């Protein structure tokens, strides 16, 4: 092990070994050590010109939605309902018709402006101890 470089290669190479590109273990390490700890460029602001315009993308294994909220601010949220994990917005890009993301599965509703859970349509009464502020899209 003493003869390894800081990136674990035995010597300087023109290209990385193929397992660096195809091995699942390297991919998982990169997700944890690189992609989850740094800012990531997702798009130019010009792609979200109108209020309520959005785009969806994947970063690693996370499905993300970027939206210009009703106040004109850009927001990024997990594009996954906190109830049963359904994708909130299937389209790649577009303009929302309202200021609310509604899950197609059980109609949980989230604010486009804040990501906060607004309404739980599948329950007439919330269970004891259920805290809406703990199940936002953030």
What are these regions (language model features)?
Residues 48-138:
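Rieske [2Fe-2S] iron-sulfur-binding domain
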